[in-house]
Amino acid sequence: MKRLSIIVIIGIFIITGCDWQRTSKERSKNAQNQQVIKIGYLPITHSANLMMTKKLLSQYNHPKYKLELVKFNNWPDLMDALNSGRIDGASTLIELAMKSKQKGSNIKAVALDHHEGNVIMGQKGMHLNEFNNNGDDYHFGIPHRYSTHYLLLEELRKQLKIKPGHFSYHEMSPAEMPAALSEHRIIGYSVAEPFGALGEKLGKGKTLKHGDDVIPDAYCCVLVLRGELLDQHKDVAQAFVQDYKKSGFKMNDRKQSVDIMTHHFKQSRDVLTQSAAWTSYGDLTIKPSGYQEITTLVKQHHLFNPPAYDDFVEPSLYKEASRS
């Protein structure tokens, strides 16, 4: 009887071991078969929803894809990687993406990255009523000429009744702007967070205007995906956008958004807390009306001929995704 019991126990161990090995092999095989999605970004609050998406994905037992976030330090390098197909998508300036589409790049915008979160900074102690047509030109830093930040400054110039040409612009990476302001190389800058809050924290800058006060809820950054991913792996793209949509509503929880940014960005928690107060997420649908506002401004400022909404935006993935 004792011998029989030992044989039974050994048999159970053998069967269990085989099952464990089979399960382990199946998991390994599933991991190998997962589609890897490479998404480019700059370390700004506008891209933080990607980090929340990656965190959400890590909580799944059987994720449908792998998300690889690829960090860039400037917009030209990011767009070169996107347009050449070295990455599958990006969180990028909407105007840059529109220009790439107009030039023939195989990309589509599927969702916004954020709402608000843009500032116009000036030297500490500066006031808007100091701007006039009598003095020297005013030199501002912008991340790129094809950006909502350029449009915000040009619209502010018009609101202040400053003649064209009195605002000059210098393209620089967002991270360079607070130092350039401190060194008086520029009189101000327009940029994404957290570099507005950082400028104030360093004691050299002052927020002259929030973007919303110049152009209410102007679209700024969008999530774009390459056509190859959308055409050849539609189910994977849908799963990614599903998680991205869920994460956008999670980002409206201020503590969660600050936690995720503190984990991924270099700035202090105080700076990122201020940035989070100026940036919102939630519903990230690219609406025709919001897109039309940007295309109108792009045309008014003679930047380029923008693509039509239907040519540039693929709204169905975000629309069909559940928020919970």
Q: What do the PLM-derived regions correspond to, one by one?
A:
Residues E95-L96, H170, A175-I260:
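Pocket-lining segment of extracytoplasmic ligand-binding domains
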Residues E26-L160, H170-E171, I187, V191-E193, ...:
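Short, glycine-/small- and polar/acidic-enriched structural segments
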Residues K299-S324:
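Conserved C-terminal helix/tail region of periplasmic/extracytoplasmic solute-binding proteins
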Residues G125-N133, K161-P164, E228-A237:
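Short helix-loop capping/hinge motifs at secondary-structure junctions, enriched
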Residues I44, F72-P76, S91, P143, ...:
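Soluble non-cytosolic domains of exported or imported proteins
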Residues D231-N305:
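Secondary-structure end/capping motifs
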Residues D19-R22, Y65, R145-G165, Q242-T273, ...:
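Ligand-binding clefts/hinges and TM-proximal coupling segments of bilobed small-molecule sensing domains
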Residues M1-V36, R323-S324:
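Short, low-complexity disordered leader/linker segments with a strong preference
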